[in-house]
Amino acid sequence: MTLPTRPDGLVVIVKRECETCRMVVPVIEQLTNGPLPVTVYVQDDSAFPESLAPIHDADLSISWHYDIETVPTVLRIENGVEVTRTVGWVRDEWQRVTGQTDLGPNLSAFRPGCGSLSVDPDLVDELRVRFGATTLSARRVDIAEAEDEFEAMFDRGWTDGLPVVPPTEQRVMRMLTGTTRQPTDVVAIVPPDLVEITVEKVAINAVMAGCKPEYLPWVIAGLEAVCNDTFNIHGVLATTMPVGPVIVCNGPGTRAIGMNSGMNVFGQGNRANLTIGRAIQLIIRNIGGGRPGEVDRATHGNPGKISFCFAEDELGSPWSTLAESRGLSRTTDAVTVFPGEGPRCVVDQLARDPESLTNTFAACLRTMHNPKSVLAFDAIVVMGPEHARVYAEAGWDRERVLEEI
């Protein structure tokens, strides 16, 4: 949509529902007697304020393009360009912006404003689609009115066997607010079909997986990590082994988005853990074509192929983090990906010294696949706090634990 022409002079945006807006009507009337022309836009009631011949911003286009978050807002426009503004009612600020003195002498010097309708949570997604500068380029799929949208997505093969969230334009635009990258930016080439995926397509699948916008950078990072020759997601799919991407997240951002790094860390119940991993798996399936029975040749598979993503307990760990061991700062948000099976439990309730406990870990790790196999297999050891405490009390650091095992 074309940006509305900004009239020179003073522009005031109000709504009747706001008590502060009603309070400052006499002040706006004062402004009309000054040297600058005054244009009043009202968001809700087209007759408010009646004495000022307001323009009804019925579709909120003016409020959206003027980036109005609070009403009343007063803007000063010169040659079509905003030079200053103030929000709410602060007498000194109104006088500074308007260049007039003795405004509202009978009013208190300050009163906060109200939220603009253009940032109303019930309206903002629709307004973002209607007026936002970003135009989504993905193909639209129309669902018949009588068709169940959830069943329609199952029928089209877009799911991992669980219901997915319909990726409406409003939801996708909201998801895109989680990143500063452009929707048209290419994130990766997704195997096995080697299809370019843009930030927009990542956002669509993140919506379907149930992600929040703040999870989107983690989905993008995880996708970049699996879609390269080092990880080789094509090979992970094509093997008959029951493996899939295991995504370990590090950094302060894991706590900011509420990832689980504690009890039940591999289990259900945490939205960030489950949906970040799920979004990546949906992308491999929906964009890359990695579907079971086709390129995905796993004989048994494992439940982690829906999602296997978790955060390291950096605050509770006695050691440096996984990301630090790979050369990154503790303050850096990072993902590490590993082609892994489902978790298995190492039980030792008797060991009280690190040597005995190390023997237990080594004995369990030797059983990977087949204890008599001459092939070596990699593994991630996620140590519980009780076992970690045994090593920490003995003064063993992370490097020694790994070396001894």
What positions do the PLM features span?
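Thiol-based oxidoreductase modules, predominantly thioredoxin-like and allied folds used
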Residues: 35-59
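N-terminal leader/targeting and pre-domain segments
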Residues: 1-7, 105-108
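Structural motif
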Residues: 13-17, 41-45, 384-385
